[in-house]
Regions:
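Alpha-helical transmembrane segments of multi-pass integral membrane proteins
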Residues: 1-212
Length: 212
């Protein structure tokens, strides 16, 4: 198991670097349809730093999930940058030049709940790597279930993609609008409660640690 974890951790670095390289290449060839230097730099910096910190924690404290959560979060940011660049190039700059651009748009536009999963999960297991006991544990489970629901349901909407990809057809089927709204609202409420609970649980543990 130790070897498997090391292989996974070390594999994440070249994957992240390859993703960043692909992003830069596609954006450099997208002309005026590029996301822009500032946005690309921000995504790459966030993805690289998160992946790097996660990698160091994962190989030094492999049983603590914080490193693995950060590693996964960094790879997600890297993939968002790459899929955005892929869509910019294949949909806007050179239409129909690349396969599967509609799936890249789905990932870029409809996986936004993932942006909040990592930081919420880290908050709940900080610093020991274990979920807090008592009242915080049920709230953590509510957060997990709510985020899972948002991730699963969000892509199946009838709404158009955000600009500049509004004209792209969603390759996935859509849920009934009423059912979709109900599931999204429940998921959002649970996720928001979970994020507030995560912040309060960190505050509670810090107060307990300092005796204040």
């Amino acid at each position: 198991m130790h070897r498997v974890r090391l292989i996974v951790a070390w594999s994440a670095l070249p994957l992240a670097l390859a993703s960043f390289g692909a992003t830069l290449y596609l954006e450099a060839n997208s002309g005026s349809y590029s996301s822009g230097l500032l946005k690309n730099a921000a995504f790459i910096a966030a993805g690289f730093s998160t992946t790097g910190v996660g990698f160091l924690l994962a190989i030094r404290q492999e049983r603590n999930p914080i490193g693995w959560i950060l590693l996964a979060s960094g790879l997600y940011l890297a993939l968002v940058g790459t899929t955005t660049a892929y869509a910019n190039y294949g949909v806007l700059a050179n239409p129909d030049s690349l396969p599967g651009t509609e799936w890249a748009v789905v990932f870029e536009d409809r996986t936004w709940p993932m942006l909040f999963v990592g930081i919420t999960a880290v908050a709940y297991v900080f610093p020991t790597g274990a979920l807090p006991a008592g009242r915080w544990r049920p709230i953590a489970w509510v957060a997990g279930v709510s985020f899972a629901a948002l991730i699963l349901v969000t892509p199946f909407t009838t709404e158009a993609f955000a600009d500049p990809f509004a004209a792209v057809n969603n390759p996935l089927p859509s849920l009934d609008p009423g059912m979709y709204a109900l599931l999204i609202n429940l998921g959002m409420a649970g996720a928001l409660a979970g994020m507030v609970g995560a912040a309060l649980s960190v505050r509670s543990r810090l107060k307990a640690a300092t005796g204040t």
